[in-house]
C-alpha cells in the first residue's frame, strides 16, 4: 500500500473517532485508607473487560486504567485480602471469587460499596454514582476531572460499619464489623429488594434500613429507587478519580 493511502486511511480513522466523540476516559484510583485496598473492575453489557480487572493498591498509592467510549461498568475495593498456601487469593469483604487478584469478569460479592460509571451514554453524556444498594464495605467517592455541565463529585465518606444495625452486620473473626449488608441481602424480602410485587417507586419506598444508609451518605444510592440526589452527570469526555476513604 502506498504511503499516501496509509496516511489517508489513518486520517479518516482519526476523523471518525473525533466526530463520533470517542474518548478513552482515564480512571485513577487513589487509596486514602490506612490499609491496602484491592480494587476490582467489571465491565457491563457483556462487553470486553478493561485491561485491569483487579490489582493491589497500597495506602496513599494511585493507579490508573483507561475505559473506552462508550462504556459502562462498576468499581469496588476489596479489603482484608490474603493468599493461602495453595496460592488462592481471597478477601474478607467484596471478594470477586476468582481466586486471583484479577477478577477476570467477576463482580463483587455483597456487601460492597460500588462506584458505577456510564461513559457517553446519551449524546456524549456520562452518568456516575456511588451505590450502597449492594451494601457497604468501605467509604468511596468518584469525581470527574474536566468535562462540561454539572460534573459534581459523588461521595460516601462515612464509615457506615460504625452504625450498621445488628441484623446487617458482617463480622470478622475478632468480632469487628467489617461490612454492612443491604436489607435486601439480609432478609430477602421484596419490600427491601424492590422486586415484584414491590417493583415500583410507589410500592418500594425507603425503609428504616435504607434511611440509615441515606443519613450517613446522602449522595449515594441507599436503595434501588433512590434516584433523586444520587445520579450525577457530566459531558465533554471527563476523566475520573475514584478514592477509597475520601
UniProtKB/Swiss-Prot annotation:
SUPFAM superfamilies, sorted: Osmotin, thaumatin-like protein
Covalent S-S links between cysteines: 33-245, 81-91, 96-103, 151-234, 156-217, 164-180, 184-193, 194-204
KW Signal (keyword) present: yes
Pfam families in the record: Thaumatin
Gene3D superfamilies noted in UniProt: Thaumatin (2.60.110.10)
Transmembrane intervals: none
Highest taxon, organism lineage: Eukaryota
Localisation: Secreted
Predominant cellular place of this UniProt entry's protein: secreted
GO CC aspect terms: extracellular region
Record key words, sorted: Allergen, Disulfide bond, Secreted, Signal
Entry-linked InterPro entries: Osmotin/thaumatin-like_sf (IPR037176), Thaumatin (IPR001938), Thaumatin_CS (IPR017949)
Secretion signal, residue range per the UniProt entry: 1-24
Keyword presence, Transport: no
Xref: PANTHER family: OS03G0233200 PROTEIN
Family that this chain belongs to: Belongs to the thaumatin family.
Protein known as: Thaumatin-like protein 1a
Lineage: Eukaryota, Viridiplantae, Streptophyta, Embryophyta, Tracheophyta
